């Protein structure tokens, strides 16, 4: 250990922070699309570790670490190679690192080599060697290991059952028997009568040592968290999917603590099992949370692309879920916790996480489930782990009915069948209320006939930041169509939004304005089979003319309007006018704005326009689509300069304006919400034929 101290270079903290901010790694973080919060992690990079010098002198790879210092595990690192590297390269790179370290008098312990999940390896080494490792060929980035934690601090079964189907006994549409659920948790008491014969405890185990030399490993303590969650998923009496089979992987120790690296190895174990013996629908339950981790999110993305459904706890820190992993991974279904009154769960001074990275909430307080104290004992537990277990069970029920559902289709159905607008949003911080979904998970009333529905969801971007040229970007899942794009700014200063192609996919971009506090981009993402969509743009016109963007191709219908403008005064004093025609085929905008029409062709697709305006400025104006129609586009028709933006909440278009009492405005001009509502006759007909 003395060698480590003698070789370390100490930098003055202000100079070190300046080097970090100016370094190329910071620029790379802004460009990376694996997670919007990566720059937060990079900003906290190695303040006192002497790593800034390494990142400035020839290192093409980047270094990442947990933003929460107490959770960091210095000395253990995940080295991730570039995607195009050969399968043999991880071992070769590890051996090269070991050889070069040995020449410098250091020993490196190779703990694990990743092949099937991502190319890379796990090593234990001195942090003095990070400069050397970052300069190795083929290395993409290195992440310091960090801790993850269990997230647990029969009203619940009644709550997830649709109201008109409730009876004295919980009766889901099916038992989820076609689905296999992997649980990454503590060990499990497989002999408990709730789960006996339903759980297979695998031989996998990768856990850190418990803290403290006097910790006594009682079986009941070591098994408690995993046993309870296994019972919530598939227990005979208290389970959601009573027929689902469950496989247990131990990644948390007896204190409910694990590491990012252990979780990665567990996920790779699942991927290997899937490759060796492909099974039907597969759900992975991740009832744990740690600080934001690029490598853990990347692993979840790889597994999701292989057809695995991942369900994760949002976290119990009463904080933005986007700051934690795996909750922040876009490919993961992230679940917050509510109580019996459908309100957010409070756990002492903490509580459920929230924000745009949460997909929905589920029962997570005083949940009765199997106890590891004895084979017939039950116990009540609370937390987002319990909430995630409910959604994993609901997913098993849905997948048993429709085994071919993709992740995007399953997520859309979970959102569609949830109870809506039942959570008191005042519990959340004010700036998070508009971003947090007001959805509580529920079983579908029937597992048949849902295919006729045109499913859409709203995806919010991360906040752009306050600089004049700042942009925000929202994107849909690969299987979804981006049917419209809108923007929102709490200050009202923005330069509109547009849809742009990036990397073969369309994304929604929103633009901040001078003096603004930042902007959000809001994408409307839909499942539209056999769709052919395109964007038609009308550039700024003459001073006395408006702009019109048309859907001129035969059979194409308008699904959304957007506009952006470069002149600051236009955004401040003359916002663009977006009004689809009587037949939704064109978008009309202000003469100084570029107006964009999203036009789509799909079998049986039909759309119409709904508009609702008020004669004087209001803080909020809404218009909703009728039952059977789905909102695809939402925009504002303003006659005032105080529009904050427009966004979709379920099938309702919401237009927000600044509080007139605070702006001093005396304008009497109307504000209108304009909705484009669509449906697919083709999907409805196909569903009826199947029935």
UniProtKB/Swiss-Prot annotation:
Protein name (Swiss-Prot/TrEMBL): Proprotein convertase subtilisin/kexin type 9
Sulfotyrosine: residues carrying this PTM: 37
UniProt GO BP: apoptotic process; cellular response to insulin stimulus; cellular response to starvation; cholesterol homeostasis; cholesterol metabolic process; kidney development; lipoprotein metabolic process; liver development
Signal peptide: 1-29
Record-annotated disulphide pairs: 222-254, 322-357, 456-526, 476-525, 485-508, 533-600, 551-599, 561-587, 607-678, 625-677, 634-653
Phosphoserine found at: 46, 687
Record-linked CDD domains: PCSK9_C-CRD (cd16839), Peptidases_S8_PCSK9_ProteinaseK_like (cd04077)
InterPro entries registered for this protein in UniProt: PCSK9_C1, PCSK9_C2, PCSK9_C3, PCSK9_ProteinaseK-like, Peptidase_S8/S53_dom, Peptidase_S8/S53_dom_sf, Peptidase_S8_subtilisin-like, Peptidase_S8_subtilisin-rel
Record: glycosylation sites: 532
Function: Crucial player in the regulation of plasma cholesterol homeostasis. Binds to low-density lipid receptor family members: low density lipoprotein receptor (LDLR), very low density lipoprotein receptor (VLDLR), apolipoprotein E receptor (LRP1/APOER) and apolipoprotein receptor 2 (LRP8/APOER2), and promotes their degradation in intracellular acidic compartments. Acts via a non-proteolytic mechanism to enhance the degradation of the hepatic LDLR through a clathrin LDLRAP1/ARH-mediated pathway.
Top-level taxon of the source organism: Eukaryota
Organism: Saimiri boliviensis boliviensis (Bolivian squirrel monkey)
A GO cellular component annotation in the UniProt record: COPII-coated ER to Golgi transport vesicle
Active site: 185 (charge relay system), 225 (charge relay system), 385 (charge relay system)
Cytoplasm among keywords: yes
C-terminal domain: region residues: 449-691
Organismal lineage: Eukaryota, Metazoa, Chordata, Craniata, Vertebrata
The protein's Enzyme Commission number: 3.4.21.-
Chain residues in the propeptide: 30-151
One Gene Ontology MF term: sodium channel inhibitor activity
Name of one Pfam family that matches: Inhibitor_I9
Residue ranges of every copy of the Peptidase S8 domain listed in the record: 154-460
Span of domain Inhibitor I9: 76-148
Activity regulation statement: Its proteolytic activity is autoinhibited by the non-covalent binding of the propeptide to the catalytic domain. Inhibited by EGTA.
